[in-house]
Amino acid sequence: MSDRKNMKLFALNSNQEIAQKIAQAVGVPLGKLSSRQFSDGEIQVNIEESVRGYDVYIIQSTSFPVNNHLMELLIMVDACVRASAHSINVVLPYFGYARQDRIACPREPLTAKLVANMLVKAGVDRILTLDLHAVQVQGFFDIPVDNLFTVPLFAKHYCDKGLLGSDVVVVSPKNSGVKRARSLAEYLDAPIAIIDYPQDDATRNEGYIIGDVEGKKAILIDDILNTGRTFSEASKIVEREGATEIYAVSSHGLFVEGAAELLDNTNIKEILVTDSVATKEKTPKNVCYITASELIGDAIVRIHERKPVSPLFAYNKKK
């Protein structure tokens, strides 16, 4: 077993709360650093203890303000490189820019690949992240990437609440999220349904359901909850089609301005999200947070001890 004395964890400014929980799960205190922003917007990071020869883990979600948090991360990585860290591992509970993972129209940038290149060029040796928007983003990096899944966490939550079986239906509010919905449905032994829209429905007012939600408890699942519009529209559709109760779950709760008000005006009973993102905006009254810190902490320990991370990808239900 590798000695955790060779490991150091550092938290930047995006999500101090989850960083503290991750440190507790790993059993290693957070290292000392200072990070400040000058009046002109420049960021300065100072590591206040030696990292020479250590395996360094830097915890930072690149959430709002995305560019500040990304730049702070890059500066910290450079500081670790120049301070002779043995390895630099970046822990991204939420990876901003991952949605820009394809060229959808002419002359459009591939920004997820650009950010990957920046991190690798800065000196990152490994990425540990949580529920990438698209798993193929892993291929944008020329270094190892461990992409942890939140569905097992959600499955445990719903199983503990008794939300499983044929009385439940897992609904993907868009056709691109079918795989995610199917994964949760398999844990819950529940059917799935998909909300789709006609190709010419620019205002998204004519959504229809593929599958059956009538008389069932519907669980809407998406990876990123940003404005709340997707869940708001989907909740109206499943309610119209006869769902008896509506739940919503998302890996990353960004909750931009106005999202809480929009979601508070729906009949969604509970909105379940992880603590991957710390937001200063108002959150919905019925939001429920579950922590991903133990999952991430377990992954860090396994990486450091040269053990496989794959056992963390599943939740074993009690028979």
UniProtKB/Swiss-Prot annotation:
Quaternary structure and partners: Homohexamer.
Taxonomy of the source species: Bacteria, Bacillati, Bacillota, Bacilli, Lactobacillales
CDD domains assigned: PRTases_typeI (cd06223)
Residues binding Mg(2+): 133
Catalytic activity: D-ribose 5-phosphate + ATP = 5-phospho-alpha-D-ribose 1-diphosphate + AMP + H(+)
Binding positions for ATP per the UniProt entry: 40-42, 99-100
Species name: Streptococcus pneumoniae serotype 4 (strain ATCC BAA-334 / TIGR4)
Protein name: Putative ribose-phosphate pyrophosphokinase 2
GO terms for cellular component: cytoplasm; ribose phosphate diphosphokinase complex
